Amino acid sequence: MYKLNYTKENDFSKHLKFRLNHTKFPHAPLKGVSFEYGFNIDYLKKIRSYWLNNYDWNARLTFLNSLPHFKTIVSGLDIHFIHAKPAASAKNLKVIPILLIHGWPGSIREFYELIPLLITPRKNVDYVFEVVAPSLPGFGYSEAAAIPDWPLPKSKFYVSGGNWGFKIGRDMAIAYPENVLGFHSTMCMDVHLAPVPVAWTAVNVWIGSFIPGFAVAKEDEYRLYPLRDYTNWLWTETGYLHLQATKPDTIGTALLDSPIGLAAYLMDKFSSLTNPANRKLPDGGLTKKFTLDALLDNVMIYWTTDSILTAVRLYSEYLSNDYIKLKFDAAPVKVPTACARFPYELVYSPDFRVNRKFKNLVRISKYNDGGLYAAFEEPKIVANDIWTSIPLFLEARQNASSGSS
């Protein structure tokens, strides 16, 4: 294991500016159209101008280096991770190890506002967190896997994640229930596609369209109904998923060679998948939750490491027959689980499906704002949810131990 520092690369910055200055933009957008057709071209030109004239890569590198970076070998791969230990004032507190797992099109940048909220002690709380946040294989500074592997963890820890962090964390909880002490997620869902659970859910949801409260609680009805609106939104916003699952190297190659194309493709998701209403806004609502610096930090992590192609391959690997044969989607999660539910998750599973999947569900909390990238969008809310979940995890483990003795 060794420490990694992002380094300042003047030649690289000059090359990037040359590419940005010679961007070939398409024709102007349709009149009266904002983000309905994808990233708005007029706003993309403003992004390019900010990137060229206001975004200071060297200053951002200093910011990225404000958290300690390391690399280590895991299953033969060079894996990059942040390892943030508690503040010095926490010396008499119990240290809780937690693994934060990012998703796509995010990166470790998603956690920069969250991590300080976890490693800083809270008044009248007898524990604090030690955080490990890896770059997934093929993302950022982590080496891509030629053949997917499942390394056996040797320690015990808690896991938190949304987006791909949910799916990977869920699978870890199923595969290694003795190592994963508790699973916290901002995107709990049951994606078991076997005929019986799918048919049962379909019937419940269909009846719920006629009888309010049948399939979902009244306060959650807007998540599914009207069904036509929900279905249309899913079709509109999941095209990238099918493309990356079937032709990852094609889209990866296209994005690898165009910084402005990469920015548009990544930032589009931070617009539409944080709130569907953002499609109607000329700036895609991007600066409602994020700064342009934060969004460009994320783009730069992909651009400087040439990792977009290997990152999108994750979709193909997880939808492959080899992965499906592992039957993680069908297996129950038995470790203590806490679900933080946000209104604009990409895929909504009714609570009865969530309870079916997670057999030791200690908490479901519901919030009024936020989408697929909750830790990046709402770090304070996610931090509070994690802090609140730990005592419930400990209690569930203690009750399980008492019951088995």
Where are these regions (language model features)?
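C-terminal subdomain of alpha/beta-hydrolase-fold enzymes, centered on the catalytic histidine
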Residues: 244-405
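Beta-sheet entry/capping signal
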Residues: 79-81, 96-99, 128-132, 155-159, ...
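Conserved HGGG/HGGXW glycine-rich cap/lid loop of the alpha/beta-hydrolase fold
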Residues: 91-143, 390
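Non-catalytic accessory segments flanking enzyme active sites
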Residues: 13-87, 294, 303-306, 310-325
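Alpha/beta-hydrolase-fold enzymes
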Residues: 207-265
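Conserved hydrolase catalytic core segment
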Residues: 117, 121-126, 155-220
